[in-house]
From Swiss-Prot:
Ca(2+) binds at residue 136. This is Probable endonuclease lcl3. The active site is at 131, 139, 179. Belongs to the LCL3 family. It is found in: Mitochondrion; Membrane. Its EC number is 3.1.-.-. Residues 11-22, 257-268 have a biased composition (Basic and acidic residues). It is an enzyme of class 3 (hydrolase). It comes from Aspergillus oryzae (strain ATCC 42149 / RIB 40) (Yellow koji mold). GO terms for cellular component: membrane; mitochondrion.
């Protein structure tokens, strides 16, 4: 039986519609790779990708905050400085620093979400313990040990000089007490004759006779031979003038005791007492 002519035409149209639908679906699912290589697409994509990668690198290199000494990358040692605010001064040659990467330019101090905490509970596990490089200050009373002469004066001076101030530290290394041994620098508005001159905190303590050059057999760190010479010269001048803890040094050398000698004597006494028990 032959189908009417119009039936064949209808079947042909259906097949054509079905083929057109398949072609349409295929075109929707196909990826036009050529479009990605067109300048109008390629250039904005490259700019956006480069911008994102650059922003991540800047954040990682300049704006990442270190909460404690252990978090500081060894790549910083002797190469890069860390800016922060001193939140407490524990003794005559050490303090705690709250890292503020980028400083005021990054919003620290004036943006509401970038303020240095003041409460102790908010500062817990969020500060870097800094040990001043190249110097040894007299020991305060602690762990049952008596206070050394000029220990309080050294602590009070350091507190007045750096507490709540912005300080920049050059980290030399970490020590066994989870601190960083670092050179610390501070700028003060009232500084005669040159305001905002950068001051080396360790050097300032030596010139005032509030510390001696660090003399331990191991673990001494100055930040280089040039700084060591500078520190020893400052100590020599203070010693000659009898400044600070050097007062009476010439008259009673045998009775005078350096911070290093004091710690050595205390350690020997404690060992002796331990053996006696």
């Amino acid at each position: 039986m032959r189908w009417p002519p119009w039936a064949s035409e209808s079947q042909a149209r259906d097949k054509q519609d079905e083929q057109n639908q398949k072609n349409w679906d295929k075109s929707l699912n196909a990826i036009d790779w050529a479009a990605f290589t067109e300048p109008r697409t390629l250039i904005p994509t490259l700019i956006l990708t480069t911008g994102i990668i650059g922003a991540l690198q800047i954040h990682r290199r300049y704006l990442r905050r270190f909460p404690d000494a252990v978090s500081i990358s060894p790549s910083y040692f002797r190469k890069r400085t860390i800016l922060g605010q001193v939140t407490s001064v524990g003794d005559g040659d050490g303090f705690r620093l709250y890292h503020t990467p980028g400083g005021r330019l990054a919003g620290w101090g004036w943006l509401p979400w970038k303020r240095v905490p003041t409460a102790k509970k908010d500062l817990r596990d969020k500060t870097i313990s800094v040990r001043l490089a190249g110097v040894d200050a007299p020991e305060l009373a602690h762990f049952g040990r008596p206070e050394q002469p000029y220990a309080r004066e050294a602590h009070e001076w350091l507190t007045s000089y750096v507490l709540n101030r912005r300080v920049r530290v050059l980290v030399h290394r970490q020590d066994q007490y989870q601190r960083v041994v670092a050179s610390a620098y501070v700028r003060r508005a009232i500084d005669f004759p040159i305001p905002f001159r950068r001051r080396d905190v360790s050097y300032e303590m030596l010139t005032r006779g509030l510390a001696t050059v660090y003399e331990a057999k191991a673990g001494s760190e100055f930040g280089g031979p040039e700084l060591e010479r500078k520190y020893r010269e400052a100590e020599s001048i203070a010693k000659r003038k009898g400044t600070g803890l050097w007062k009476g040094y010439r008259r009673n050398r045998k009775g005078w005791e350096s911070p290093r000698e004091y710690k050595t004597r205390m350690g020997l006494e404690e060992q002796s007492q331990g053996k006696g028990n």
